[in-house]
Amino acid sequence: MKWLVILGLVALSDCLVMIPLTKVKSVRESLREKGLLKNFLKEHPYNMIQNLLSKNSSHVQKFSYQPLRNYLDMVYVGNISIGTPPQQFSVVFDTGSSDLWVPSIYCKSKACVTHRSFNPSHSSTFHDRGKSIKLEYGSGKMSGFLGQDTVRIGQLTSTGQAFGLSKEETGKAFEHAIFDGILGLAYPSIAIKGTTTVIDNLKKQDQISEPVFAFYLSSDKEEGSVVMFGGVDKKYYKGDLKWVPLTQTSYWQIALDRITCRGRVIGCPRGCQAIVDTGTSMLHGPSKAVAKIHSLIKHFEKEYVVPCNARKALPDIVFTINNVDYPVPAQAYIRKYVVPCNARKALPDIVFTINNVDYPVPAQAYIRKNANNNRCYSTFEDIMDTLNQREIWILGDVFLRLYFTVYDEGQNRIGLAQAT
């Protein structure tokens, strides 16, 4: 088997390290099973894109603010260790943020009690950086302090690595999450000031030949997914990698040419932006564009689906019981983006065109079945439109399960190829 370094396609034998990822139940699924999702969404309205675009306003004085893009659907986790001797943690390898953080033993919040926590006094290599940090999320907050220690990711070792330790975590999303913390893989420009990102530290310490990493997200229920550092393994994709230049070096953001269905443009008609994000499960887009997609789904499968923006105009349905009226409003009887499961076979591909290359997403991918109630849901979700009206999409795991993705920080580009 030949390992390839992205920049020069030079054969490697020792430089590529692969970390297995496990697909676990998302926070959204956990909340839905417990009947908590509806109230949670009411209590925590979230503007994903506005948080993404406000990154530069987050670093104020000695605090660092970093938004988490999708607070319910982080489902692929891997293991790392911190300290000497190593303390183990399960983290999300997240291309939408740049910092590493885990809970600390000083955190007594409910979210921390249910997760593993780092004990600085048990590590001979720990150093307190003497800086407070505060991470703001759509679903809550994490506050703590900055430390540094030895971080091990598989066979890779990052010494003197800066990371956050939480002292307080609020929000049900943290309480119900399977993961302990987050390992950010975005650019240094959105990291805590004065710190070096994990990927840059690995390169600086010659642990990897190039600042390159790649994701293969398996469609299997649990095992088979990997994140690889320093190169790629060709067995995880078919054909050649198609390279896409970044439009900015903060998040992994690229230009999206258009979105089509059976040759008809249904989104991004004049070109727009897309963020490729392993920390997001769904396909997120502007509300009008997503409504158009769901209208098309309704047209093709002919029944049951109602555009969400129609709920405001629909009347109450009234049940009269023992001469007493019990109205049920449309907000209750129209669930969000429910699709008959048998419609998946009839629905067409939705095609994302990136850098003049078509990337089809079939209905089997964008219509997901919930194992608990056998209902199917569209994985297209709308986000609040931003003040500047820029059309931005988030290509999450629905897209990344179909396409093997390489993140090349050295040349500021993303490589895409059909996953095996």
Curated annotation (Swiss-Prot):
Glycosylated residues (UniProt): N56, N79
Signal peptide, first to last residue: 1-15
Annotated tissue distribution: Expressed throughout the chorion, with the signal localized exclusively over the trophectoderm.
Keywords from the UniProt entry: Aspartyl protease, Disulfide bond, Glycoprotein, Hydrolase, Protease, Secreted, Signal, Zymogen
GO molecular function: aspartic-type endopeptidase activity
Gene Ontology biological-process annotations: proteolysis
Residue positions of the active site: D94, D277
EC number of the protein: 3.4.23.-
Enzyme class: hydrolase
Cellular location(s): Secreted, Extracellular space
GO cellular component, one term: extracellular region
Disulphide-bridged cysteine pairs: C107-C112, C268-C272, C341-C376
PROSITE patterns given in the database record: ASP_PROTEASE (PS00141), PEPTIDASE_A1 (PS51767)
Similarity comment: family membership: Belongs to the peptidase A1 family.
Protein name: Pregnancy-associated glycoprotein 2
Taxonomic placement: Eukaryota, Metazoa, Chordata, Craniata, Vertebrata
